[in-house]
């Protein structure tokens, strides 16, 4: 009969219950020792499996499963299952527990009890796990501890189970090299060498290399490059997730942590614990009045019995650690700052070999330098060196993916060959003379494609063979790790063979392969990671076009002012200034810590201020909606300032971010339009000062948003009454311009005006400008009609008629749009509904001589260009 819960540990009780379930599953009427053994050894993390691994024993699962399968079945399945005479081995288990002085029956007692069954004992002996060997392994695992807790089995070798030996990883060469950070490493070692309070805590922003410092200390311990007090110590990284996982019962988490701490305390050589994200121990495991992890650590930390390296971010240190003064006092802070671009380049150069070996590609030094520079300039919401390393890693992954796919030239030819072969098969079935002639031509085409394809495939295979061999040789450079291990272990013969024979041969072969690849001028396979690959990754992440300009982009930028002129009529000065600013930015010559450009557009309503901003967005992003538009008439109250940067803490909407900061934070390359800026409350302008000067703004959550890649435009109607003079000349325009600027200076404060790159005054639209506006408006109507298959054509006299009846000098171009919508677009809509417009037809709008009303004529099958 199985023991009650109070007589067994949780693991033992679970094993006995699972053995009963195993017997029921196999339709056995009783529980055999083989059922219990199978359950124990199936649990890979259980004590029984750990004993077998410690003994390097063979597998026992298959013979045990065969033994269970050979047991007699009972049909129908029995309702109750009992233990066989030796299935529970209950008397022996109780006797074994009493013999060693244990309060509860544990899994190790079950394991020893299995040897009372002759069949199970034979299986264990065949796997080289005799009873004596198992008892010895259990004694070594228990280390003299008595079974007094229901969770006892989980506490055997707790340090190995709930922590990772960083020194072991360093010995095996599995840790990345730590470049630089000498001051922080030495400061940490000095704190560890103290008598009391020898617990450093690494504090820094996420991604600056806190964990790398702990790994660097592990590598120094392995090399012996540490003070005598740290020689032969081991550095373990505590896995809090493994400690907490599965600890559903009260007290289970505390038992696990106490067993880890006791092993650390009792270790002969000394153990240093590294706890990443140490703020998590504050409150970890706390529930229903039980202690949290921090309170278990505090006494040992204070007495110097436990040496711990913690790591956390500045924000989490302030939020969690500083609130627990007793916990904070037991640690000495070591601040880890973000490395400079030069230091980051050194770090990347040190890691380059690892990434080359992993991805099987070559990384140029230019790519390393550009990765650090672009990461520093454009990826502003993360920290070095983490963001630069990620850039290199993703660029390598992209090149590796391209290496794994066939070149486009070969792919096109192979598809063409398959199509021709399918056509040839179809033609072979056709007996007509024309088909036979066509078949000859198709076979000739297949022959020609094969002749073109064969050398390409041969060249591709040769290049892939070299690259695959290069990757294999780079991975074999792990022999350097064996060299370091041989030197540490004093195996000088092996070290000499590796240093003067094996490693030089590998390096010579790598050098030879790289030279062969370099000599090939036109390659089908690109295995190098260049600065262009890194820039492409930055462009994908941020939307900022930092990749090298293609010929199309060059022509587009050089002709930018011409494209803008087509859309914005009569504002030559404004267009030229905006185009010049964009060219400076795309050439990489804009100031690094300020917006790409900042303008104040002044002028009367309807002259093209907002239209020019839309045109810039359309030219840069192919979509005029791709801009952040802030209508300043919505910010007339003083309290509305918070909407730009986000509501303060404690207010509704704090987590949603600001209407200005959030779009720019997510899409840092954008056009930001502050429309009708004079209508906002004066306090709103204070928010803009830092944006215009330093290209940065801190939102309500303390995050710095980078505006250095934005074009900022403010529009205003201030002083527009001075520009409505119909008799304007170039000389009078300068006077009028000064009057407008005087009005602006009297309204806006000097600190705002002084931060703008340029103040552009838009001219009043002249008659010839308005003709171009009419053309643009009709082009917009034709764009809307394109999907219906219609187009509109205006006679010359119609434009004058529209200007005469639709133009208002004080209102600019907007009245023209309203007039065209009312008198032309409405008539087109009426004709469409009445089905008076056949498909693919042109609607000609004309004005009869002496007439006062437009007429509409329809021509089918002609475009507006073909209609004379």
Curated annotation (Swiss-Prot):
PROSITE patterns: CLP_R, CLPAB_1, CLPAB_2
Phosphoprotein recorded as keyword: no
Cited Gene3D superfamilies: 1.10.8.60, Clp, N-terminal domain (1.10.1780.10), P-loop containing nucleotide triphosphate hydrolases (3.40.50.300)
CC terms in the record's Gene Ontology section: cytoplasm
Region (Repeat 1): 8-75
Gene that specifies this protein: HSP100
One term of GO molecular function: ATP binding
Record region (Repeat 2): 83-144
InterPro entries from the UniProt entry: AAA+_ATPase, ATPase_AAA_core, Clp_ATPase_C, Clp_N_dom_sf, Clp_R_dom, ClpA/B, ClpA/B_CS1, ClpA/B_CS2
Location of the region described as II in the Swiss-Prot/TrEMBL record: 529-720
Residue ranges of the region described as I: 159-407
All copies of domain Clp R, residue ranges: 4-144
Family named by the database record: Belongs to the ClpA/ClpB family.
Protein name in UniProt: Heat shock protein 100
UniProt keyword list: ATP-binding, Chaperone, Nucleotide-binding, Repeat
GO-annotated biological processes: cellular response to heat
Residues that, per the record, bind ATP: 204-211, 603-610
